[in-house]
Curated annotation (Swiss-Prot):
It catalyses: (4R,5S)-dethiobiotin + (sulfur carrier)-SH + 2 reduced [2Fe-2S]-[ferredoxin] + 2 S-adenosyl-L-methionine = (sulfur carrier)-H + biotin + 2 5'-deoxyadenosine + 2 L-methionine + 2 oxidized [2Fe-2S]-[ferredoxin]. It comes from Ralstonia nicotianae (strain ATCC BAA-1114 / GMI1000). This is Biotin synthase. Belongs to the radical SAM superfamily. Biotin synthase family. [4Fe-4S] cluster binds at residues 73, 77, 80. Residues 1-25, 340-360 are annotated as: Disordered. Pathway: Cofactor biosynthesis; biotin biosynthesis; biotin from 7,8-diaminononanoate: step 2/2. It is an enzyme of class 2 (transferase).
Length: 360
């Protein structure tokens, strides 16, 4: 009986070379839909090949996300429990004191995180609010952690203020495809989001931009989201992929759950189309069993949010995360800012690994 060689790729898995490797090439939505349509094993095989070409396939970055200002947001994002328009049980809170934030960052670092993200439920920050966040960024940076904030829309001078404070990444997601966006949000336009991303990039801050699946979108629209991200010039350094967390009181609380394999496909397609980006397994991970998370790592996810609340939704317990990664033989990547905006786009600086030992 003959066996195919280890490097055998079936015809169904063969697609054109990755356009993302050419500065002037663009991904058509049709090409992205063709990736989604591949047999599952072929898609994961291709995604894993791309992943190994650019990253250590057994390394994962641990990120911690802290909600520094929770609730009371005036926007109407239909998935979000922090909107003041919905009765979700989330109470509006004031901006956290800087000492509280820095204590949380220190705990995150002690628990193995190398990236600390701060999120505030604002449409856009006011000057005094941004001053406070800039101080937080300086304090977290001084601990040797990679910094990211998500604060809503920014003007150019606000982005520059954050850059001057030493911010590494600014997160501002597109959420979904342009044609489906109006079904989810009406208080902020797609162009508003693109404008903020332009200001962030012009300031020299690394872009963190992804989306949410399971909003009720079609596969065609999921492909549209990936196309928007992959065709940015350049594509984002950091791409969080969120699976809708259905929260009682929000308009999407009754949505039908996305097929778990479709979520894995989305991770794989993001990896193939944005080969050098950090693909972050974000909201919704708490509902995934260990096998599904392992498939996401196989598909090219190389960062997880770890150990704290993911804004206002539960994230898996830190010890469970440690045990899972240890069972998979994965290592924690300790990074000295993977992507520096001052250097070459998507270049990687030195990094080392630490083994994960689960707590007793």
């Amino acid at each position: 009986m003959q066996h195919a060689p280890l490097n055998f790729v079936p015809d169904a898995a063969k697609v054109p070379p990755t356009p993302g490797q050419s500065p002037n090439a663009r991904w058509s939505r049709e090409a992205i839909e063709a990736l989604f349509a591949l047999p599952f094993n072929d898609l994961l095989f291709q995604a894993q090949q791309v992943h190994r070409a650019h990253f250590d396939a057994n390394a994962v970055q641990l990120s911690t996300l802290l909600s520094i200002k929770t609730g009371g947001c005036p926007e109407d994002c239909s998935y979000c429990p922090q909107s003041a328009r919905y009765d979700t049980g989330v109470e509006a809170e004031k901006l956290m004191p800087i000492d509280t934030v820095l204590e949380a960052a220190a705990r995150a670092k002690q628990n193995g995180a190398s990236r600390f993200c701060m999120g505030a439920a604002w449409r856009n920050p006011k000057p005094h609010q941004l001053d406070a966040v800039a101080d937080m960024v300086r304090g977290v940076k001084a601990m040797g952690l990679e910094t990211c904030v998500t604060l809503g829309m920014l003007k150019q001078e606000q982005a520059q203020q954050l850059k001057d404070a030493g911010l590494d990444y600014y997160n501002h997601n597109l959420d979904t495809a342009p044609e489906f966006y109006g079904e989810i949000i009406t208080t902020r336009t797609y162009q508003d989001r693109l404008d903020t991303l332009e200001h962030v990039r012009d300031a020299g801050i690394n872009v963190c931009c992804g989306g949410i699946v399971g909003l009720g979108e079609s596969r065609h629209e999921r492909a549209g989201l990936v196309a928007e991200l992959a065709n940015m010039e350049p594509y984002p350094d950091s791409v969080p992929i969120n699976n809708l967390v259905k929260v009682e009181g929000t308009p999407l609380a009754g949505n039908e759950a996305l097929d778990p394999f479709e979520f894995v496909r989305t991770i794989a397609v993001a990896r193939i189309t944005m080969p050098k980006a950090m693909v972050r397994l974000s909201a919704g991970r708490e509902a995934m069993d260990d096998a599904l998370q392992a498939l996401c790592f196989m598909a090219g996810a190389n960062s997880i949010f770890y150990g704290e609340k993911l804004l206002t939704t539960d994230n898996p317990e830190a010890d469970a995360d440690r045990k899972l990664l240890a069972r998979l033989g994965m290592r924690v990547e300790v990074q000295d800012h993977l992507h520096q905006a001052e250097g070459a786009q998507h270049s990687h600086s030195s990094h080392c690994h630490i083994d994960i030992t689960p707590a007793d």
